[in-house]
Design a protein with these regions (language model features):
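Glycine-rich phosphate-binding loop signature in dinucleotide/nucleotide-binding domains
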Residues: 67-74, 109-110, 191-193
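A general structural detector for well-ordered alpha-helical segments in enzyme core domains, enriched
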Residues: 27, 31, 64, 95-102, ...
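Cell-envelope and extracellular/periplasmic
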Residues: 15, 47-52, 79-86, 142
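Serine-esterase "nucleophile elbow" of acetyl-processing enzymes
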Residues: 1-50, 62-72
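Active-site segments of SGNH/GDSL-like serine hydrolases
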Residues: 80-84, 102-134
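Catalytic His-Asp segment of secreted/periplasmic serine-dependent ester chemistry enzymes
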Residues: 120-201
């Protein structure tokens, strides 16, 4: 049986790279470690840039990601969206346009994208603005038929998430990244890869 080879290129900010995780895995490393199928060979490439908003991401993603794509394999794109536009005072209309441009380019290249939305912080007032950003990002993705994993809503009031941020200087630690990985794995990861859910079949 010929192996399927999927090349996953992931773009995003420092949370994608596992910043603050003592194990150095982050949520993406945990997700990849859990994705096992005897008929599948996965190749992953992490392209993280700290403190990056949607405009900078839109400017750099194609030049960096396209070097990892190959006509010989199935190419997939993970977009780990940050909350940075809130701090940069980017309007939601501009955030929407930046993400739409990324997804439209990916669609033109027949690349299926999975988006992971921004995670909540500890500041409730700031979280209100991140909630709106999350809503906008989700709308853009779903209108274009790409998978969107909402991490903000389930984690906003999650006691373990907030405790982990408090203990780790405002960034996730092992527990926080584990929660993010669980959400990704259980909210569309396997269907996006066209794989059976674990335990099926």
């Amino acid at each position: 049986m010929e192996l399927r080879t999927i090349r996953i290129t992931a773009i995003g900010d420092e949370l994608l790279a596992g910043h603050g995780d003592p194990r150095g895995l982050g949520w993406f490393g945990r997700v990849m470690a859990r994705t096992q199928d005897p008929a599948l060979r996965l190749q992953s490439f992490v392209l993280a840039s700290p403190a990056e908003g949607s405009e900078a991401l839109a400017e750099r993603w194609l030049g960096e990601a396209s070097r990892r794509f190959s006509d010989q394999y199935e190419n997939r794109l993970v977009i780990a969206l940050s909350d940075r536009d809130v701090d940069l005072d980017v309007t939601t209309a501009r955030s929407r346009l930046n993400l739409a441009n990324i997804l439209d380019s990916a669609s033109q290249m027949n690349i299926k994208a999975l988006l992971v939305g921004p995670a909540p912080g500890l500041d409730d007032a700031r979280n209100q603005r991140v909630a709106e950003l999350n809503r906008v990002y989700s709308d853009v993705a779903l209108r274009r038929n790409h998978h969107y994993v909402d991490t903000f809503t389930p984690l906003r009031s999650h006691a373990q998430w907030r405790a982990d941020l408090n203990a780790s200087g405002g960034v996730p630690g092992q527990a926080g990244y584990g929660l993010m990985a669980w959400l990704v794995l259980h909210r569309g990861w396997y269907s996006w890869l066209e794989l059976p859910e674990p335990g099926e079949g």
